[in-house]
Amino acid sequence: MADKVAVLDPEPITLLDTEDEPGISQSRRSSIANSNFYIERAFVTNCTIISGERSTPKFAVWKVTAVLHPLNPNSSGSYRIHTYKRYSDFVEFRNALLDRVRTKRPASVSEIPELPPPVKWYYSWKYNEINLNKEWLANRRKGLELFINQVLLNGNIVDIAKDLVIQFLRPRK
């Protein structure tokens, strides 16, 4: 690849527990980014197909956007964190979440959502045909967006794995 994409790292965020703070609704408590912002939701968009090198097949890269809003009602505007992830990044993130939750709070394992399914092994001979199909990609995008929102807006998961959430939202270098 001759052209490289330069990515500017977002300003670091800190997820805080504000359970005892009055005036913050329960739905917002689970998505606090720092003392000034909360994560309202995330979007998975802009699927870009990348040609792998030599024997590596083509793969999809998804744009993940987390929307931050100020906690202060007098403040206006919102901020967005953008990062780009492959399906395999979501798989690694989910596996890391499962490992963390199993050790810290085993009863919460069921709160970690499933990811959309990968290409079935018996279709591996036509992997590119299936994995790059527009309908397949549209369904995968919906599943990834559902997954990331269920994770980011779940206070139990964020409380247990703040560092993993922040690491996932950081762009690769």
Swiss-Prot record:
Highest taxon in the source lineage? Eukaryota
InterPro entries named in the record: PX_dom (IPR001683), PX_dom_sf (IPR036871), Ypt35_PX (IPR037917)
Q: Which keywords has UniProt assigned to this entry?
A: Endosome, Membrane, Vacuole
The GO biological-process annotations, alphabetized, read as: protein localization to endosome; protein localization to membrane
Extract the PROSITE patterns matched here.
PX (PS50195)
Pfam families, alphabetically? PX (PF00787)
Annotated ranges, domain PX:
40-173
Name of the protein: Endosomal/vacuolar adapter protein YPT35
Source organism per entry reads Candida glabrata (strain ATCC 2001 / BCRC 20586 / JCM 3761 / NBRC 0622 / NRRL Y-65 / CBS 138)
